[in-house]
């Protein structure tokens, strides 16, 4: 994790991950989580990996069964975007990853992730994702 990428008005406001490390997905999902006081979402990647945790929580909702402890229920995953390109599933643990960068701007709440993926078949593709949880509309998660 890097904490020194911001400049100008964003100096000391950017948290960054500059390489894809499947064994550290959970750490980044937690550190870069997004929320607005009503809704919170772990910053899982758009594609699924073994061991990643996809959670979205809504304040004021509770789940209990029998004698179990009451806990926040995990609502539907609206972030997953599994992608197939020429029949190949986007999977950064296969092929080659270049120019990987995931950042969270703590001042604006914008999560961004970009990378170049060279698939096992040799296709070279550039990806860029953006995500935000709205402060103005507490029920809105936006992803591009």
Label every model-predicted segment:
Residues 2-144:
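Beta-sandwich/jelly-roll carbohydrate-recognition scaffolds of carbohydrate-active enzymes
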């Amino acid at each position: 994790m890097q904490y020194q990428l911001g400049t100008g008005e964003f100096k000391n406001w950017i948290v960054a991950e500059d390489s894809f490390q499947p064994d550290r997905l959970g750490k980044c999902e937690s550190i870069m989580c997004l929320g607005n006081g009503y809704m919170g979402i772990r910053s899982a990647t758009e594609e699924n990996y073994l061991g990643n945790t996809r959670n979205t929580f809504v304040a004021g909702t509770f789940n209990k069964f029998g004698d179990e402890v009451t806990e926040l229920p995990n609502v539907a995953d609206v972030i997953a975007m599994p992608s197939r390109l020429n029949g190949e599933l986007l999977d950064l643990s296969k092929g080659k990853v270049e120019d990987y960068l995931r950042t969270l701007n703590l001042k604006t709440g914008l999560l961004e992730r970009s990378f170049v993926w060279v698939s096992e078949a040799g296709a070279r593709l550039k990806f860029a994702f953006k995500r935000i949880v709205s402060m103005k509309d507490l029920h809105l998660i936006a992803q591009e």
